[in-house]
Amino acid sequence: MIGSFESIIIDCPDPRALARFYSELLGAEIVVYDRDRAELVPPGNPRPLLAFQRVADFIPPRWPSQDVPQQMHIDVKIDDFDVAEAAVLALGATKAGSDSPTFRVYLDPAGHPFCLIKPED
């Protein structure tokens, strides 16, 4: 082994705002924040799950177009699409794309795509 996983860093225009969005979405605690960086940790884990860093002149990904590629996205496992969708939209997400039996695509407030996923019954 060369090393161990530390965290995923996401570029954005406002780290605090995006950290609040993902904190509510994932039930994680915001443990570090200042003007240029914010970090989330999941309950019971001392390591950051996600970190957000301010980028000047941030250009959000364009999904599904690849004019500005998404480069990565987060999958969030859920139990009920309708309940989860209402919650993420209330947090400031935007629906992006059509529904599938196993996933739905949204954009976070900074424009990064993420999916709500539910295994088929």
Identify what each model region corresponds to.
Residues I2, I9-R54, V83-V105:
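Core segments of cupin and vicinal oxygen chelate
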Residues M1-A19, Q71-V76, I117-D121:
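N-terminal beta-strand motif that seeds the catalytic metal site of vicinal oxygen chelate
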Residues Q66-V88:
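Mid-chain, well-packed structural core segment of small domains
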Residues D108:
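Short, acidic, Ser/Thr-enriched surface-loop or helix-capping motifs
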Residues D57-W63:
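A short, acidic/glycine-rich surface segment
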Residues V41-P42, W63-Q66:
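Short secondary-structure boundary/capping segments
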